[in-house]
């Protein structure tokens, strides 16, 4: 793999998400590739995000201008690969094809297709299309490849650290996540918790506050408005007995946090029953709970994580993910 990517030119159009774009770039570069990284999305403020829901034309116009700038800045380069993990307008994709005709174009879908409006209409512009969702891979006849964990989660010094929490959760506050967290806290008040519930902006907080009673019952200090680094996520995981995962109700694919528990060698409590269909599933390490009536027995918290086969760690590592997408 290292020899294969050596000297390859890659244009990475990666929707920014807690620094994973930089981690992927750095890993590709460590394998010998020359990488140009851009956010797949034009920079918009909270007000513009709200406008986007009402007037999509405004957003697409801004997106096209943004990507035209990327193409003009790099038009003399002969990319071997162009990677995207976001929904790009068909006109934008046509222009990438025209500007970089020899590039292999790769799309990786890290959300459910139903949550990415129109993405299925863009498949024809890509040479390779992957999804993290097994059901979507079957429905749309595209390649299935779960997400990855980065190297920091396998840091042995962190793995052997002290345990401070029974259960920890780190994630964006969306859908019914807050109600499930509150329900678990009320039901199991004797457990030690760490919660990092990220809100993308104050605008989003007040939007939920006005419309949802659950948000009015929680002090605003509970929410975090600055994203957490991946190294800090790993540190919190290593100080926890179990990791709580609450996938979006419209998703069946496994979240990044779920895959990261493999690298961190941590047990997971999840609302996603599809985890039972994966090769790393072990009922000693995985507890599936109901969204409306979560049951978390003390016996699950105190049992030790059972190590997995070495091939599982290789498969779900960032190296394994890159190998499947680019090789």
Where are these regions (language model features)?
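Nucleotide-sugar donor-binding catalytic core of glycosyltransferases
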Residues: 2-64, 85-86, 91, 114, ...
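Short N-terminal targeting/anchoring amphipathic segment
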Residues: 12-13, 72-88, 106
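An amphipathic, basic-hydrophobic alpha-helix
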Residues: 58-78
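Short amphipathic alpha-helix with an adjacent loop that forms part of the alpha/beta core around
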Residues: 70-75, 156-158, 296-303
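Active-site proximal beta-strand in glycosyltransferases
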Residues: 97-112, 130
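Short alpha-helix at the nucleotide-sugar/activated-sugar donor binding site of glycosyltransferases
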Residues: 261-262
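A short acidic/histidine/glycine-rich donor-binding loop in glycosyltransferase catalytic cores
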Residues: 283-289
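A charged, aromatic-enriched C-terminal amphipathic alpha-helix characteristic of glycosyltransferases
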Residues: 292-327
